[in-house]
């Protein structure tokens, strides 16, 4: 009786609490005429876990037909200026990926704490030495067949939890990082004739991103060396600062994993990652999105995209974007959350008109979602690809689209669904 009365109250007041699984919520609008950021791709890092990356593994991560179709790889530069992941990078390049790299710490003897861990600062007398070493790394990588798209000056430059820290770190202020880029790293790359751009600041999260980005972009010389403005996504709310928007620099999200998974390699953690990808793309306007590691190392062995030789649901869910939202696509305007528990992002390929929609359903029930596509070439139909408790990025039928661009899709409980348009006149 109490439940019945509650449902009557919710019905009368228009609240969604007793909506049935088969009942559609608000219509999601996709406006092809309103374009946002270009997409460079999706990637991860092989550091400390899979430095050589076997051929089958490279295919799982980078093959667009049989794998999840990533298009970026982030390498670690060790304090001695080498990367143990160069063999993995060669396999990524062979599959069409862009490769870039980041250091976690300069050599201990070049820091004021004489330790690669536990923060510390790069000594002024070794700034040029470190910049030259990073530029040499980029040149050597290119000579080995791995053109270096970008070099980061420092992983998480302002992240200073209480020591002791068990990983490599080095501390910069926004001003000191800008000066290192402007006076040392940028000129060192240019001196070698490299097209390699600086990818910075790579802060630990959106919470600390603005100050570093503002320092880099407020100095015209430093800004001239910088390519993507980068951040990790461990803290804060994704957003696009006005100075970054005005600058025209792409925004890259360069590291995220669910660190609070409690050994959960299943759908619960995977949907957290899906929500983060959506928010970074839609609210943060990122052009590139990186998971932390392909295969996680201790102590977070369960937080990777792959455990053992199997992709986790987390890995397949990244593939709901990375396999279909290809480099060169552009995000277009869409209703980001058309009803409770549903997230939507939309992307188009300007040369072909292909449209890709990615919908996240975090609810415990199936949801019907109406979609209206306006202001562009309407697709005839969409193929449907689902990752859920039972499906691993598997095709699940198709949906016809009306002449007015309207259709309804069923989103399985706790799932990510990708809709890939079939172009007018195409056979499939």
Residue ranges and their predicted role:
Residues 38-46, 70-77, 98-103, 149-153, ...:
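Structural recognition of the beta-strand scaffold that forms the well-ordered cores
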Residues 31, 65-214:
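Substrate-binding cleft and catalytic face of glycoside hydrolase catalytic domains
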Residues 10-25:
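Bacterial Sec-dependent signal peptides at the C-terminal "C-region" and cleavage site
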Residues 250-325, 332-340:
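Aromatic/acidic polysaccharide-binding cleft in carbohydrate-active enzymes
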Residues 127, 167-274, 283:
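Noncatalytic carbohydrate-binding groove/subsite architecture in carbohydrate-active enzymes
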Residues 399-428:
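C-terminal beta-strand-rich structural cap/linker in extracellular carbohydrate-active enzymes
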Residues 22-59:
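N-terminal module-boundary/linker segments of secreted carbohydrate-active enzymes
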Residues 337-380, 414:
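Carbohydrate-binding surface patches
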């Amino acid at each position: 009786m109490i439940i019945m009365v509650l449902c009557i109250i919710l019905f009368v007041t228009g609240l969604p609490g007793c909506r049935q699984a088969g009942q559609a919520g608000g219509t999601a609008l996709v406006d092809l005429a309103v374009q946002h950021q270009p997409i460079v791709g999706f990637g991860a890092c092989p550091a400390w876990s899979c430095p050589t990356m076997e051929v089958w593994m490279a295919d799982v991560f980078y093959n667009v037909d049989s794998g999840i179709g990533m298009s970026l790889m982030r390498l670690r530069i060790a304090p001695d200026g080498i990367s143990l992941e160069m063999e993995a990078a060669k396999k990524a390049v062979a599959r069409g990926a862009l490769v870039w790299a980041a250091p976690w710490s300069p050599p201990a003897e070049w820091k004021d704490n004489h330790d690669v861990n536990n923060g510390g600062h790069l000594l002024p007398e070794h700034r040029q030495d470190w910049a030259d070493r990073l530029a040499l790394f980029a040149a050597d990588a290119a000579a080995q067949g791995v053109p270096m798209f970008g070099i980061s000056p420092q992983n998480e430059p302002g992240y200073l939890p209480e020591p002791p820290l068990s990983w490599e770190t080095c501390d910069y202020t926004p001003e000191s990082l800008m000066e290192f880029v402007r006076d040392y790293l940028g000129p060192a790359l240019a001196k070698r004739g490299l097209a390699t751009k600086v990818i910075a600041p790579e802060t630990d999260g959106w919470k600390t991103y603005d100050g570093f980005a503002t320092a880099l972009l407020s100095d015209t010389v430093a800004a001239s060396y910088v390519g993507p403005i980068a951040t990790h996504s461990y803290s804060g709310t994704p957003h696009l600062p006005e100075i970054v928007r005005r600058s025209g620099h792409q925004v890259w999200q360069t590291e995220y994993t669910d660190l609070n998974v409690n050994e959960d390699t299943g759908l619960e953690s995977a949907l957290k990652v899906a929500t983060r990808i959506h928010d970074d793309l839609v609210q943060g306007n990122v052009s590139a999105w990186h998971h932390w590691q392909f295969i996680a190392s201790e102590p977070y062995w369960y937080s990777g995209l792959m455990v053992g030789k199997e992709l986790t649901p987390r890995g397949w869910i990244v593939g709901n974007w990375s396999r279909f939202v290809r480099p060169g696509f552009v995000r277009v305007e869409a209703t980001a959350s058309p009803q409770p528990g549903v997230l939507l992002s939309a992307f188009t390929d300007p040369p072909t008109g292909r449209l890709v929609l990615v919908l996240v359903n975090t609810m415990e029930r199936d949801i019907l979602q109406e979609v209206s596509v306006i202001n562009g070439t309407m697709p005839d139909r969409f193929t449907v690809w689902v990752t859920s408790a039972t499906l691993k990025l598997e095709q699940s039928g198709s949906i016809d689209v009306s002449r007015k661009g309207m259709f309804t899709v069923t989103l399985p409980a706790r799932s990510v669904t990708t809709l890939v348009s079939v172009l007018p006149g195409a056979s499939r």
